[in-house]
Amino acid sequence: MSVMDAIVVKKPQAARPSSGAEKPSLIGLSREEMAAALREKGVPEKQIKMRVSQLWNWIYVRGVSDFDHMTNVAKDMREMLKQHFTIARPEIVEEQVSNDGTRKWLLRFPARGAGRPVEIEAVYIPEEGRGTLCISSQVGCTLTCSFCHTGTQRLVRNLTAEEILSQLLLARDRLGDFPDREAPQGTIMPAEGRKVSNIVMMGMGEPLYNFDAVKQALLIATDGDGLSLSKRRVTLSTSGVVPEIFRTGEEIGVMLAISLHAVRDDLRDILVPINKKYPLKELIDACKAYPGLSNARRITFEYVMLKDVNDSLEDAKGLIKLLKGVPAKINLIPFNPWPGTNYQCSDWEQIEKFADFINSAGYASPIRTPRGRDILAACGQLKSESERMRKTERLAFEAMMIANHGADD
C-alpha cells in the first residue's frame, strides 16, 4: 500500500452532554475513591468492598463501557450507577491507519468547568512480539523544544487520570484486546499475546508536570487485578524535570526515558530549554539515583539525530563520557522533518557511524525505524487535524520514541 493509501476512518459520535450535565466517571478512581463515591450514593457499607471489586473487574478486566453489560450486578444497582456515573469512552473524531499498521486516533474529551472540549491524539505501533501505545498526559505542552513540531504550542490543561487511562481502554476496545472481542479485519498486530503489551508516556505534554494524575493512571494500569500491565513494559519519558525523577521511580516504579538530544549545556539549552532550569549535571545525577536502576532496568536516553548539530564524532564521545556509570540504552532517532523547520536529518551513513561508536563503547544503540510517516504519526509529527485548522491555537504533542521501549518478557 502506498503512502496515499493510508486509511482515514471518520467516527462521528453523538455529542456529549454539556459540562453542567456531565456525570463523574468511575474510570481513573482508586479503589478508595470508588468506595467513597458509592458510599455517597447510599450503597450499604457491607456491600462496598464487593461492589468495588465487581466494578474494577468489569471496567479493567472485561473492558465494558456500559453498566448494563455488568451481568452479575443487580439491576437496581446498575440503574443507580447509570443515573450517577459514567464509564464511557472519549469520542473518536478520526481514526487513521498507516501502511505499516500504525494507528492514530484523534480523541475528544468534554469540556471541564469553564473550559472547552479538548482533543488529543493517541498512537498505536504494532511490532513483532509487542504492541506499543503512546499516551498523552497534557493538552499542549509548556516545553519549547526547538526541533519538535510542537515546540511553540501552549499548554491548555492537564489531563485527568480518567482521561489518561481512557486512551488505553479505547485502544484495547478498537484492537479487540479485551475478552470476547475481535480486532478489525486486516489489523496488523502481534501474532500472540496482548495487542497492547507496552505503553509509553510520550504523547502530548510533559508527564512530570502532571505527576499526580500520571501516577494514579499508571498505578491502575499496572494493577495486578485489573489491566495488569508489567511495570517493565511501561515507560515514562521526561525532558528532565529533575525534582520528580526520583519520585517516579519510588512511587510509580516504571521504566524511565530521558529526552536528551545533546551532551553540552549550551546546545541543550537551545534544543531542550528546560535544561536552563535543570542542567545536564543535575539531570544525570538524578538518573544515577533512580530507584531500581540496574543493568536489567536501564534508563533509555533519546537522541534525535540533527545534521551538523549534534551528530559529530565529538558528540558521540561526549555522550559516552556523560553517561559513564549510568546503566543506559541510547535510542538514536532520525529527525522527522516538518513544515517550517530549519533542522535536517543526519545522513544515514553518519547515523550508522554514530551508532557503531556508541555500540563499541558497550551501549546498546538501536536506530529507531520511523513509523506512521504517511499519517504524520512519527516522532515529533503528531498534530490534531482540528488544531491544524485553528492556526492561532496550535495544540499538538510530542511523540518521543514510541516504539522499542520496555521489556519483552
UniProtKB/Swiss-Prot annotation:
**InterPro entries per the UniProt record, alphabetical:** Aldolase_TIM, Methyltransferase_A, RlmN_N, RNA_MTrfase_RlmN, rRNA_lsu_MTrfase_RlmN/Cfr, rSAM
Which Pfam families has this protein been placed in? Radical_SAM, RlmN_N
So where does S-adenosyl-L-methionine get bound?
Answer: G205, E206, S237, S259, L260, H261, N336
Q: What EC number(s) has UniProt assigned to this enzyme? A: 2.1.1.192
UniProt GO BP: rRNA base methylation; tRNA methylation
- Could you name the active-site residues? E121 (proton acceptor), C379 (s-methylcysteine intermediate)
Cofactor annotation: [4Fe-4S] cluster
> Hydrolase: is it a keyword of this entry?
no
- The record places domain Radical SAM core at 127-376
Keywords assigned by UniProt, alphabetized: 4Fe-4S, Cytoplasm, Disulfide bond, Iron, Iron-sulfur, Metal-binding, Methyltransferase, rRNA processing, S-adenosyl-L-methionine, Transferase, tRNA processing
How many cofactor units bind, and how? Binds 1 [4Fe-4S] cluster. The cluster is coordinated with 3 cysteines and an exchangeable S-adenosyl-L-methionine.
- Could you tell me what reaction this enzyme catalyses? adenosine(2503) in 23S rRNA + 2 reduced [2Fe-2S]-[ferredoxin] + 2 S-adenosyl-L-methionine = 2-methyladenosine(2503) in 23S rRNA + 5'-deoxyadenosine + L-methionine + 2 oxidized [2Fe-2S]-[ferredoxin] + S-adenosyl-L-homocysteine; adenosine(37) in tRNA + 2 reduced [2Fe-2S]-[ferredoxin] + 2 S-adenosyl-L-methionine = 2-methyladenosine(37) in tRNA + 5'-deoxyadenosine + L-methionine + 2 oxidized [2Fe-2S]-[ferredoxin] + S-adenosyl-L-homocysteine
| Cystine residue pairs | C134-C379
Entry's Gene3D superfamilies?
1.10.150.530, Aldolase class I (3.20.20.70)
Q: In UniProt terms, what function does this protein have?
A: Specifically methylates position 2 of adenine 2503 in 23S rRNA and position 2 of adenine 37 in tRNAs. m2A2503 modification seems to play a crucial role in the proofreading step occurring at the peptidyl transferase center and thus would serve to optimize ribosomal fidelity.
Classification via PANTHER family: 23S RRNA METHYLTRANSFERASE (PTHR30544), RADICAL SAM CORE DOMAIN-CONTAINING PROTEIN (PTHR30544:SF5)
Which family, according to the similarity comment?
A: Belongs to the radical SAM superfamily. RlmN family.
Q: Give additional notes from the record.
A: Reaction proceeds by a ping-pong mechanism involving intermediate methylation of a conserved cysteine residue.
User: What name does UniProt use for this protein?
Assistant: Dual-specificity RNA methyltransferase RlmN
The beginning of the lineage is: Bacteria, Pseudomonadati, Pseudomonadota, Alphaproteobacteria, Hyphomicrobiales
